[in-house]
Amino acid sequence: QIVGAFTFSYNWVALSGGDGYFAATTPELFRNMWSLAVEEQFYLLWPIVLPLFLMLPRSWARVTTALVAATASAMWMGAVVASGGDLTRAYFGTDTHAFGLLLGVALAFGMAPLLRRLAVGDLPAWARSGGARATVSALGVAGLIGILAIASIPAGDTTATFPGALLAASVCAAMVILAGVWPGSRLGRALDAIPLRWLGDRSYGIYLWHWPLLVLLVAATTGTGPEAGVPIGVGALALAFTLALAEASYRWVETPVRRFGFRGCARRLRAALRARAARRATALAGLATGAALVAGAGAAVAAAPA
């Protein structure tokens, strides 16, 4: 698990080890790393694939190509499930679960011409019209409702879920993003509210922390895994710890690394450790938070349920 988590290959490591995402008796501590693995593998491949897209002369051709690729990925997931294949293989596979990312590619290529014109103050009249904004906002609201509806439906083990519900959720998410970035969109302004922005800025840390904390807290209090049920109090405690640790990692790890890079952070940390005691405490807090992401993983595995 640790090797897969820190090399962004968790999905394939788990599959090679026979770990089942849907097994209720073996909740892996770093199970949530599978989606980050798919994402990072896409980031590695995208610089190679992007020039091929850019060879297409028109935006519509790029959008169509991305949509065809997304459809192929979804159909491949459906084929794996329909043939009686392993659900975890269908769910974890980068090839079978790339359709959400590819829909994002299509949306980016589709919006690029409009956003370029917006940047130079040359937005076309139709895009600024009240009708366009109302239509896009309605699509965004429909997307939000769709996501909530899909989340409330119990997952099955057929193609209705793999890829049906998953693909539908990705389409709904694309609709929300479209409404969120559309110039003058009311939904975009609503989604930019301070509490939602706070959550969005820390969403990476929230995702990283939530599952290991939940597994450990449930195991410590009930002796079972989260799939067997999470008591309300334990869930609330896991949420509180998740938000606190996400804020700490955002403030003392993510933001400095984005701003100064790894080497810059190391230099600043050494300088801060030589400074007065007040600054030293802040630096140590950052060091402790970073160490928790690495050294704490090994100790956490020992406490995880079998």
Name every feature range the model reports, one short phrase each:
Residues 256-282:
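Membrane-interfacial segments at transmembrane helix termini in multi-pass membrane proteins
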Residues 1-265:
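Membrane-interface helix/loop caps of multi-pass membrane proteins
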